[in-house]
Amino acid sequence: MELLLPHPSNSTPLTVLGFLDRAASVYGDCPSILHTTNTVHTWSETHNRCLRIASALTSSSLGINRGQVVSVVGPNVPSVYELQFAVPMSGAILNNINPRLDAHALSVLLRHSESKLVFVDPNSISVVLEAVSFMRQNEKPHLVLLDDDQEDGSLSPSAASDFLDTYQGVMERGDSRFKWIRPQTEWQPMILNYTSGTTSSPKGVVLSHRAIFMLTVSSLLDWHFPNRPVYLWTLPMFHANGWGYTWGTAAVGATNVCTRRVDAPTIYDLIDKHHVTHMCAAPMVLNMLTNYPSRKPLKNPVQVMTAGAPPPAAIISRAETLGFNVGHGYGLTETGGPVVSCAWKAEWDHLDPLERARLKSRQGVRTIGFAEVDVRDPRTGKSVEHDGVSVGEIVLKGGSVMLGYYKDPEGTAACMREDGWFYSGDVGVIHEDGYLEVKDRSKDVIICGGENISSAEVETVLYTNPVVKEAAVVAKPDKMWGETPCAFVSLKYDSNGNGLVTEREIREFCKTRLPKYMVPRKVIFQEELPKTSTGKIQKFLLRQMAKSLP
């Protein structure tokens, strides 16, 4: 058998881009995209449009070459969905950028990525133009205006001098007979994503065609995605490419419901109007939906995948009483999205709701296509006991792990170590049943008098208080103890403005549920906690505030 070697017929590079060809054949007349502006496309039309954009990108007028970076600054609109396919189909590397970044941060990313072309949403024109003004002339990318909400797709006189064309104009240059450019190897870079920067400066994460394929197929299998679901885009497409569901929805012929607005009234309205079956949502979005004053149980259940910050069991429990069936995953930008999920066991169905929610708040086990997950002592590299108590750093190994950080070999070597593991920087435990539970970011662990305190554990208790809307716990420097827990809290209010609670009452609430050393010494009330656009609470800002407190 040793003479049987790989052959071109059995070693075609893995890529998700072929999902679109198949969708056009199998689901051609089925709706692919719905938009709140009444835009409706079929999978045949989406296939045609993506090929035309890819063709135009490679034309002499735009001149994008294989391996060059093309950026997208926009919300969850149809054109942004199409670009997830069209850009890599042209042989270019797709770079989605958070549209809520300021001009300085945006210019840093554009310069670092050496982006040659940027597709810009109308709401981001001013910030992108300011960002480009900070760049040297030879660094400046061409700009194309996304025109999802415009009728004729023509450039206005005011935009004509800054933009090369509109999205519709670029499409009209393209050829739907274009043979899209397949990767030469499955290790070829496909995606450049920047980390959200909740703890430090963003890093450029490079993901291969193989990584995206492995992530997407595993996600579909793990979530038991059916054919032709209706998927609501509440998760930003710029956030790890919507955890791979940008391509996964094509594989199953889903209807993608796009929306600019992600607020409770809009989400409930779209769920009802379009009979939504699936959506992804950060814990912040679940919290928002469960606290909406006009909330009422859903007519039909909606499958929700949540990931990001560890979701408190109380939020999961409240969401499920409304008809949201919550699944829970864990991953990072560096893994392309969730690679661990809380695989449900039938015997858990008979437990009481709070116990089910507690189990579901754990991150779980590796997804089907991922290789290994462990918790190890970062100093020795040895596995910790699987007892639900012994804490270590979460380490990962599998096909969807990044190629590395762009232009950052030192940063890459620091997390992709010689022992063959990717070190996540997250702290967790593994329970006796083999299920992972994330306890904290390593930077979020509070060391009080030599004892390690999981901020997530304290936050979980705070979220069980009926008047607490949001909670985050950080370290506050202390001369005697080194660090003590400091809680930042926002509160719920009823129609009469009731819901006020004192710092003492919050601390007393915690004292009955936590060891004394874990009880917050300080509680700060805020109207709303600072968050990234993907819903993660910006603890580095809260840590700075805590340092200045008396």
From Swiss-Prot:
Annotated disulfide bonds: none
UniProt-listed Pfam families: AMP-binding (PF00501), AMP-binding_C (PF13193)
Tree of life domain: Eukaryota
InterPro entries from the UniProt entry: AMP-bd_C, AMP-bd_C_sf, AMP-binding_CS, AMP-dep_synth/lig_dom, ANL_N_sf, EF_Hand_1_Ca_BS
EC number(s) per entry: 6.2.1.-
Keyword annotations of the record: Fatty acid metabolism, Ligase, Lipid metabolism
GO molecular function, one term: ligase activity
Tissues where this protein is expressed: Expressed in leaves, flowers and developing seeds.
Keyword Lipid metabolism assigned: yes
UniProt-listed GO biological process terms: fatty acid metabolic process
Role, per record: May act as an acid--thiol ligase that activates carboxylic acids by forming acyl-CoAs.
Similarity remark: Belongs to the ATP-dependent AMP-binding enzyme family.
Listed name of the protein: Probable acyl-activating enzyme 9
